[in-house]
Amino acid sequence: MTSRRIINREQRQCSQIRPYLYVSGLAALSPRVLSRFCVCINLIPGFRLSAPPHMKVVHLPLQDNETTDLSPHWANVYKEIEEARKGAGRALLLCAMGISRSATFGIAYVMQYEKKTLHDSYKAVQLARNIICPNVGFFQQLIDLEQKLRGKVSCKIIEPLPGCKVPDVIWQELYDEMIMSMSQDDRHSLASCNLSARSTTNDTMSLRSLNMVNDTSRSLASFHLTHRPIGASPTLLVPSSSSSSSVRGPIPLQRAHTEPPKEASILPKSALRDKSKSGEKKKKWRLSFHKDVV
């Protein structure tokens, strides 16, 4: 299982999706890092990046919310990335932690311009940044985009646990991670239940970084797995009779929040102050939050 140290390290990096396309969160920002890019696509509401002349900043304030509609912005983001590619420059997709919003646009771009399936596009971005996890609403929009581009889909949203909706490609990763965390006896018990969401791949797992395994394990601890004959309707989990008095229902599997309560708290100090000891105005850019930005 990926250690917290590795997760924290990845959050503080600008991940290279392609030589001309990077995904990052605020924790990775510094003057030195930003000097490498010709365009920064800022997806954070209330955040303004005043950059030097060589860098173009595109502000697209979008909430990391399942109801946020990204479709009006696909073309604009594609355009900026393509201009950077054709000009031998680098484009940076920036959101608070580089997990949901920026990753979603990166996946959409790969799917659109490299003619890949959604599954393969997700894996391509995940390979570069293991901690990505678009929220369910964003993933559904990616599915809709794939349907529009290819006339068919390679991923779907499933409900493997009561009240828990998740993309099947992510659930497969979660299932494998959950199996790894179980004892041998629990694995045999789980194997006896023909779960339709069981993983059959050895893909890299991204949910290690989001603590979803622990949430699922706690949910499974309150339920027992049932055998079902071949051909019977799928039965995933039912309340355990031994704990029926204390169990009110399944513990919903919650996706980790990708936005900190105060986004400014994860900004590196080096990005907020001019370290120059001279009296000259050498500061060429600054990071700031504006309450009037929505």
Swiss-Prot record:
Residues 13-151 form the Tyrosine-protein phosphatase domain. Residues 234-294 are annotated as: Disordered. Keywords: Hydrolase, Protein phosphatase. The keyword Hydrolase applies. The active site is at residue 95. Pfam families: DSPc. GO terms for molecular function: phosphoprotein phosphatase activity. Belongs to the protein-tyrosine phosphatase family. Non-receptor class dual specificity subfamily. This is Uncharacterized protein ZK757.2. It comes from Caenorhabditis elegans.
